[in-house]
Amino acid sequence: MKRPWGKAVVKDPNPKITVHGFNNLTKSLSFNIFDIAYAKTEQHRQEYIEYIDELYNAERLTEILTNVTNIIGANILNVARQDYEPQGASVTMLIAEHETPPVGTDWDEEGPGPLPETVVAHLDKSHVTVHTYPESHPDNGISTFRVDVDVSTCGVISPLRALNYLIHSFDSDIVTVDYRVRGMTRDLDGTKHYIDHDINSIQNFLTEDTQNAYQMIDVNVYQENIFHTKMLLKDFDIDNYLFGAGRDEFAQTELDQIEERMKTEMLEIFYSRNLG
């Protein structure tokens, strides 16, 4: 399933706050990513689960999270990973900031991070985790694959740098993104700061191509430094969603019914409510 790519255009950096001691702000970025498919038979549904389970096994997820830590400019301290039976996998990494971030790096700049083609901290609270949840409907043939990713950093490194990479690392039909900043830090005058960068929407940290490819809605609570964005892929081509069979194996009326069910499934996940 081909997904939109695009070149990240990094915005001008925000004025930096010179802090007293260590930057104690905790920045947390959480993803729920859904990939949807239609598997006609019970055999196809089982093959889909096995395919997804192998494609995103613990080894592959470790590779993705390793790239995430490189993108945000962190060091890996420890890795714990596990494949589960009958399906699913999880990986947890403890990460820390570089001891001395090189001058001129953009790890602490809030802007679109790199895409894949360009590529738990026992420091405090910094960690990266991922869990996978393959499942299928026993009757109507719809199968879903959910990935939960959490990136939490304490200090100057920003999890938003990994935003574009993570979206394009999976076949992302629906994406729910949450970003929050917690704690406080002080500048040299002793003034407390509860956030150290400007942000009015998570959408500002996506490439233009990604913004154009997805329908997006925001629910933000600015005074609490909570930002929430939902994303639904705009273009729908049934050929991209048929697993184990081509369109020539279906009558046109059946294809129309499948497409309607698939779109309903995606809308229900997007809005987090049943529409039927």
UniProtKB/Swiss-Prot annotation:
<comment type="function">
    <text>Catalyzes the decarboxylation of S-adenosylmethionine to S-adenosylmethioninamine (dcAdoMet), the propylamine donor required for the synthesis of the polyamines spermine and spermidine from the diamine putrescine.</text>
</comment>
<dbReference type="GO" id="GO:0005829">
    <property type="term" value="C:cytosol"/>
</dbReference>
<feature type="active site" description="Proton donor; for catalytic activity">
    <location>
        <position position="154"/>
    </location>
</feature>
<keyword id="KW-0068">Autocatalytic cleavage</keyword>
<comment type="subunit">
    <text>Heterooctamer of four alpha and four beta chains arranged as a tetramer of alpha/beta heterodimers.</text>
</comment>
<keyword id="KW-0670">Pyruvate</keyword>
<comment type="similarity">
    <text>Belongs to the prokaryotic AdoMetDC family. Type 2 subfamily.</text>
</comment>
<dbReference type="InterPro" id="IPR016067">
    <property type="entry name" value="S-AdoMet_deCO2ase_core"/>
</dbReference>
<keyword id="KW-0210">Decarboxylase</keyword>
<feature type="active site" description="Schiff-base intermediate with substrate; via pyruvic acid">
    <location>
        <position position="126"/>
    </location>
</feature>
<dbReference type="GO" id="GO:0008295">
    <property type="term" value="P:spermidine biosynthetic process"/>
</dbReference>
<feature type="site" description="Cleavage (non-hydrolytic); by autolysis">
    <location>
        <begin position="125"/>
        <end position="126"/>
    </location>
</feature>
<dbReference type="GO" id="GO:0004014">
    <property type="term" value="F:adenosylmethionine decarboxylase activity"/>
</dbReference>
<keyword id="KW-0949">S-adenosyl-L-methionine</keyword>
<keyword id="KW-0456">Lyase</keyword>
<protein>
    <recommendedName>
        <fullName>S-adenosylmethionine decarboxylase proenzyme</fullName>
        <ecNumber>4.1.1.50</ecNumber>
    </recommendedName>
</protein>
<keyword id="KW-0745">Spermidine biosynthesis</keyword>
<dbReference type="Pfam" id="PF02675">
    <property type="entry name" value="AdoMet_dc"/>
</dbReference>
<keyword id="KW-0704">Schiff base</keyword>
<keyword id="KW-0620">Polyamine biosynthesis</keyword>
<dbReference type="InterPro" id="IPR003826">
    <property type="entry name" value="AdoMetDC_fam_prok"/>
</dbReference>
<keyword id="KW-0865">Zymogen</keyword>
<feature type="active site" description="Proton acceptor; for processing activity">
    <location>
        <position position="131"/>
    </location>
</feature>
<dbReference type="InterPro" id="IPR009165">
    <property type="entry name" value="S-AdoMet_deCO2ase_bac"/>
</dbReference>
<feature type="modified residue" description="Pyruvic acid (Ser); by autocatalysis">
    <location>
        <position position="126"/>
    </location>
</feature>
<comment type="pathway">
    <text>Amine and polyamine biosynthesis; S-adenosylmethioninamine biosynthesis; S-adenosylmethioninamine from S-adenosyl-L-methionine: step 1/1.</text>
</comment>
